[in-house]
UniProtKB/Swiss-Prot annotation:
The LIR motifs (LC3-interacting region) are required for its interaction with lgg-1 and lgg-2. The keyword Coiled coil applies. Disruption phenotype: No colocalization of P-granule components with lgg-1. Furthermore, there is an accumulation of pgl-3 positive P-granules in somatic cells of embryos. RNAi-mediated knockdown results in increased lgg-2-positive autophagosomes following fertilization and at later embryonic stages. One of its GO terms (cellular component) is cytoplasm. Residues 381-385 are annotated as: Required for interaction with lgg-1. It comes from the Eukaryota. Residues 671-684 have a biased composition (Basic and acidic residues). Residues 666-690 are annotated as: Disordered. Signal peptide: none annotated. Keywords: Autophagy, Coiled coil, Cytoplasm. This is Ectopic P granules protein 2. A motif (LIR 2) lies at residues 684-687. Disulfide bonds: none annotated.
């Protein structure tokens, strides 16, 4: 089961890694596309910068030309002092007019260039906007890919949570097993302690039992010795008693014999008495004598009887004393037997307890063996679970590393995108700010230059007018006689004043033109500001879209967390199904592996077949090349033969014409047939040659 579980974990991890790898490949491709588009965008930016530089250079060139025109006009206005110089000034004026026309043409050309550059700039702006739209589309695609990757990450998170729940289950099982192992270890320790206590109790009981047995054995030996002594004494006493009894029996027998003899004598005497009574008279004396003798004998018998009765009483007392001693001995023996029975009962009880303790020890040993086997099995299961846990932890670590790497990559990509967007925003702001600043600076420079030119022209005119007035005053003070000359000079001065006025009017017209150009520049500046505002609004919209996307991502993450919690709840229900599915997946994986092996074999076969086909193709190509060469040779031969045949046909036609000119109609009818036959023969020869 552990191997199956590890296989399922690795299979699930391998199945989960496929969409992650696809997402990573797609992200890498998109990164490459973004890098290429960034390069193109940078090239466009460089082109725009170059165009702006050219525009600035053109403006500076136009300002320089205007300065040169102003200087030329100043020279022309200052060159009208003398008549000799007037011709030169006229020539210079013509040249300057020509140059002015050329400058106007150059201005028009520059305006055309400016218009073309502005069109190019607008086209570049449109291209930039198109690229921005493309970038937005790419961003949307990246967002969709990110969503797919997020979905894959969610799946990975779900599988991680499943693996974590399985790890928690394994850990709970391991904890329960550890608790059981600890409890069993505690029970083992208790059993060992009980065994030690029982062994100590057994040792103490065995010692007590051995000491009691020794005491009993010593007591038994003493009692046996006492009993043996008592038996020996009893035997001795019994022998003595038997001897005495035999003596008494012999005496009793003797007395019985004597009594029988006496009874026989008494009977004889009674018979004699009967005989004597029969002989009463005759024998009273003898009877009396015999009565006296009988009385003496009876008295003697009475004495003997008394003696016998005394001896019998004495013997009865001895017997009673012996009986009492025997009873005492029997009581002692019974007491000893009871003590022996008690000792034997104690020994039997102790032996039964010892046997019970031995059985308990055996049972405890069997339980210990069973517990050891269970502990060994539990240790093996614990090792297997540890290995499974390590495998699961490894897979979890791999998945976590993959997730962390993917999350880091996504964060890095997100940061890069944000940094790129910020950089784009900053670059756009900087570009347009630089453009605005450059335009402001250029317009201010142009306005300042025009104002400086006008002021310089006015100051130069004023200085010239003051110098002329001073010269006129000096001349008026010096020569009153040359009043006509002075009048002429005054007329000249008036004419110079008219020229100055015309120059002033020209300057005012130039100032109006400059003001109009300033107004146009202001309008262009306003348009540029509007474009900048539109771009800023566009970028603000992009930023708002990014913020909306961020909020949507955060909401999705929130919903994802809620779904993860729901999935955690559902995961507890689907664990049994997961086990079944893992078994089915293992079977499918095995089938897939077998199919992969078969596919690899087929792929190898196809590779070999492809190699054979490539070799055949190479050989076929060589044969085709040879055939093409032969076809080319045959075509060349056919072309040559056709050319020869055409030449022959031309010759035949010429010959036919000659024959027509020389021969009649009938022969003409036959000759075309011959010519057709010759042509058919020539064609068949061509076919045979081909």
């Amino acid at each position: 089961m552990s191997a199956n579980r590890t296989v399922t974990v690795f299979s699930s991890s391998a199945e989960d890694q496929e969409p992650i790898e696809l997402a990573e490949d797609s992200l890498q491709n998109l990164d490459k596309m973004l890098a290429e588009e960034k390069e193109e965008h940078q090239l466009l930016k460089d082109e725009v910068v170059l165009l702006r530089k050219e525009n600035v250079e053109a403006k500076t060139y136009s300002t320089l030309l205007e300065i040169m025109l102003d200087e030329a006009e100043e020279k022309a206005s200052s060159a009208q002092e003398t008549t000799s110089e007037e011709n030169n000034l006229k020539i210079l004026n013509r040249d300057l007019v020509a140059e002015n026309l050329e400058l106007k043409e150059m201005k028009e050309e520059l305006r055309k260039i400016w218009l073309s550059d502005s069109k190019k700039f607008q086209e570049a702006l449109t291209r930039i906007s198109d690229e921005n739209t493309k970038l937005q589309k790419d961003c949307h695609e990246l967002e969709s890919i990110r969503q797919c990757a997020q979905f894959a990450l969610d799946n990975c998170n779900e599988e991680l949570e499943k693996t974590q729940t399985e790890n928690e289950e394994h850990e709970s099982r391991i904890e329960t097993l550890e608790r059981e192992v600890c409890e069993k270890d505690i029970a083992m320790k208790d059993i060992v302690e009980r065994k030690d206590e029982i062994s100590l109790q057994l040792e103490l009981q065995t010692k007590e039992f051995t000491s009691a047995l020794n005491d009993l054995m010593y007591g038994r030996e003493d009692t046996l010795k006492q009993i043996h002594q008592m038996k020996e004494n009893w035997k001795v006493k019994q022998n003595e008693f038997e001897v005495e009894i035999t003596k008494l029996k012999s005496q009793n027998d003797y007395f019985d014999s004597e009594r029988l003899q006496l009874t026989d004598r008494i009977r004889a005497l009674l018979n004699e008495l009967s005989d004597v009574r029969l002989e009463l008279g005759s024998t009273r004396l003898a009877m009396k004598e015999k009565a006296e003798v009988t009385e003496a004998v009876t008295s003697f018998n009475k004495d003997l009887r008394d003696k016998l009765e005394d001896e019998i009483a004495r013997l009865g007392e001895c017997l009673q004393f012996r009986k009492d001693e025997h009873e005492q001995d029997e009581a002692v023996i019974a007491h000893l037997e009871e003590q022996l029975k008690l000792g034997s009962d104690k020994a039997a009880a102790f032996s039964s307890e010892h046997s019970d303790t031995i059985e308990l020890l055996r049972e405890s040993e069997t339980e210990l063996m069973e517990l050891r086997m269970e502990n060994y099995d539990l240790k093996e299961d614990f090792k297997i679970l540890k290995e499974e846990k390590e495998d699961v932890n490894r897979t979890c670590e791999c998945l976590r590393e993959q997730l962390s790497t993917t999350i880091q990559e996504r964060d890095i990509e997100k940061g890069q995108m944000q940094s790129e967007m910020d950089a784009k925003m900053v670059a756009v702001h900087q570009q347009y700010a630089k453009q605005i600043d450059n335009m402001k600076y250029n317009h201010m420079l142009a306005i300042n230059q025009e104002l400086i030119k006008g002021q310089m022209a006015l100051e130069s005119g004023k200085k010239k007018h003051a110098n002329e007035i001073l010269t006129v005053r000096n001349e008026l003070e010096q020569s009153n006689a040359a009043h006509q000359s002075l009048r002429d000079q005054c007329s000249l001065l008036l004419s110079s004043e008219d020229d100055l006025r015309t120059a002033h009017l020209a300057l005012e017209s130039k100032m109006t033109l400059v003001s109009e150009e300033c107004i146009a520049l202001r309008v262009s500046r306003a348009n540029a500001q509007k474009e900048i505002g539109n771009l800023t609004e566009h970028h603000k919209l992009e930023v708002a879209l990014l913020e909306d996307a961020k909020s949507g991502i955060q909401q999705r993450l929130h919903y994802a967390t809620i779904e993860i919690e729901q999935l955690k709840k559902i995961n507890e229900v689907t664990q049994a199904q997961f086990k079944k599915e893992t078994d089915e997946k293992n079977a499918e994986i095995n089938e897939f592996q077998a199919a992969m092996v078969s596919m690899k074999q087929q792929y190898n076969v196809l590779g070999n077949h492809c190699r054979v086909l490539t070799s055949q193709g190479i050989s076929d190509r060589t044969t085709i090349d040879k055939l093409q060469e032969t076809i080319r040779e045959h075509t060349e031969l056919a072309i040559e033969t056709k050319r020869i045949h055409d030449a022959e046909i031309v010759q035949l036609n010429d010959a036919h014409k000659k024959l027509v000119d020389n021969l009649g109609v009938e022969e003409l009818d036959e000759e075309p047939k011959a010519s057709t036959e010759s042509e058919e023969k020539a064609e068949w020869e061509m076919v045979d040659e081909e």
